[in-house]
Amino acid sequence: MLAARLIILLSFYWLSASAIDPADPLFVDLPHGKIRGRDNGFYYSYESLPYAEPPVGELRFEAPQPYKQQWTDTFDATQPPVTCMQWNQFIFGDNKLVGVEDCLTVSIYKPKNTSQSSFPVVAHMHGGAFMFGEARQNGHENMMREGKLILVKISYRLGPLGFASTGDADLSGNFGLKDQRLALLWIKQNIASFGGEPENIIVVGHSAGGASVHLQMLREDFAQVAKAGISFGGNAMDPWVIHQSARGRTFELGRIVGCGQASDSMELKNCLKSKPAGEIVSAVHSFLVFAYVPFAPFGPVVESPDAPEAFISQHPVDIIKSGKFAQVPWAVTYNTEDGGYNAAVLLEKQASSGRELIFDLNDHWFDWAPYLLFYRDSMTTIKDMDDYSRKLRQEYLGDRRFSVESYWDLQRLFTDILYKNATELALDLYRKHGKSPVYAFVYDNPANTGIGQFFAKRTDVHFGTVHGDEYFLIFENLARGPEMRSDEEIISRNFLNMINDFVVSGNGTMTFGNCVLQDNVGSNKFQLLSITKNGCENLQLESFP
């Protein structure tokens, strides 16, 4: 059904598309009317363009509907995108509620480059564990200064508003993924009006954004809207991506906000539609064991096969094994200390005791580990969980206690379980069942400041190359300082050239600097590019280091 609607909508918009006014590039004609963008010196921006009807009222907890309104006046595309309503981990303090429910927009950034008449397109999905984040959290000026690519940032529903699910056709879930899908369709249909090349669209994202890219690519019809994808620091194999106990959690959500009387999914959905959005999103607090743990209490699900417009109805592993996914080039990445994103908060000194939270793991490891590492819902008995928790602690820490001194091994555990192992699994599946090129790289070059220092609120600990250290060289982020070292400037330029070359390449090749990444499909060994301060090197591995 989604594929049929795709063909119909593509046909409509291709017939309707028009171009930028050559007399004034700030004005663009779209099927809904004329828009006015902003001149930012070295690039143009066209922000907050709606691609879907507001997901409010009866459209809450429903698949997104294409935007229908016709503008009689020129649409003001100079306002930055609003934040989708969320309980945001990056807000310190008790009240983390921010954003609005009516938020489904795309924002377009086009470089001023008179040497190019058209531009390849990067569709960007922000990260945030499917719970928080926004289109504005990652900058675009690095990419605009290079002057080679149009960037489109996508806003999508998050947390319970985007991913509540009862596991049946009545409240199927994955609304945030369906938002992304409709946004990609909008880009395909309309980007030529901005000077973009609809035949040269690549989708990129980081963390949950990277996992989103991968999930989009697991649909065979992805190839109709984009030609390649890059998943930085997250993919569909990560244990925090696919949720197995969404039904119970969604009914618990209903109980928290006053829908405890609901006896079935439809009654629950109707009740939730009547509640203020802020109450629903604020209920996230009740699912956290401590701090912001687990960091993803709501997220993607495997939908019921009879759900209308199901996004996926098989587990990603089974989809890949079936071969029924988009056979287009894909790249997947991880950082050597990705897990610092999850572990660093344990190094913050607590106001009440003056000591770090990591010491509390000595008394609460068996209680907290299943939530920290996302196996609470995948094991059937408490004994299974305790046995696995004990095994992990022994493997990574031996007989040592949790402390600041043992932090490095704790983050190593988090890196392996939450990121690295999933990257290895994804590559293993693709090299056996894929047909189009699949590439991988590992980044090992610590930033001076980053997410580790941000959450730990300290700089006296070596955090390594933490989650986002590579991505923020492409898309700026306030979690790291604004300045780049000379080696990072070179790496940033190489990343931007890599993305550009990947999307315009006719044969799906991928190059970083002077290194050509090697395809994993059909390979007996893992082909992994190592990127460090000193350059790049192709590795052939039996297993990940």
UniProtKB/Swiss-Prot annotation:
Q: Where is the signal peptide?
A: 1-19
UniProt keywords (A-Z) are: Disulfide bond, Glycoprotein, Hydrolase, Secreted, Serine esterase, Signal
This entry's Enzyme Commission designation comes to 3.1.1.1
GO MF term (any one)? carboxylesterase activity
**Cystine pairings recorded for this chain:** C84-C103, C259-C271, C515-C536
* Location in the cell: Secreted
CDD domains, per this entry?
Esterase_lipase (cd00312)
User: What effect is documented for mutating M266T?
Assistant: In strain: GB4E, JR50E, GB115E, GB139E, GB336E and JR341E
Q: What is the effect of changing A291G?
A: In strain: JR50E
Per the record, what are the reactions this protein catalyses? a carboxylic ester + H2O = an alcohol + a carboxylate + H(+)
Result when mutating V98A: In strain: JR50E, GB8E and GB115E
Coarse class of the primary localization is secreted
Query: What does the UniProt entry list as the effect of changing F42N?
Result: In strain: GB8E and GB336E
Which residues are the active-site ones?
Answer: S207, H467
Which residues, renumbered to this chain, are glycosylated?
Answer: N113, N421, N507
Please tell me one Gene Ontology term that the record gives under cellular component. Answer: extracellular region
Q: Which family does it belong to?
A: Belongs to the type-B carboxylesterase/lipase family.
Q: What is this protein called?
A: Esterase-5C
What organism is listed for this UniProt entry?
A: Drosophila pseudoobscura pseudoobscura
Lineage here is:
Eukaryota, Metazoa, Ecdysozoa, Arthropoda, Hexapoda
